[in-house]
Amino acid sequence: MLLADARRSDACQLLMSIPGVGVVTATSFIAAIEEPGNFKRSRSVGAWVGLTTRRYQSGEVDYDGHISRRGDSHLRGLLYEAATSLLTRCRAESDLRTWGLKLRERLGFKRAAIAVARKLAVIMHTMLTTGEPFRAVHAIA
């Protein structure tokens, strides 16, 4: 049933052109976002899902903490799975995968997967607003 609905939806087909993003992730993202125009910028989607770091500032102390975990935890988990799949299983080369693998060397796998998940959310929102398909090269904004 879900697969049949996704095949009929142009938006789902558009999002599923991203390596690592399947039917469940695409439909869940569309259902959670509802209307892409609700966000002023695509960058705001990462914060809305809870994939950006919390900031602590007091006096001379200023550091970024863990992710905020705001928003839809189910969608956050699906984006993390898509990022994990992109980094580990997808063999198609893309700028996003290359960027994620470089981050993995420097930060470790989990932090790199969170960063790629946030970037995926931003790219998915941009794709929904513009209607352009995923480009493996120059996908990083």
Predicted ranges, named:
Residues 1-141:
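A detector of single, family-specific signature residues
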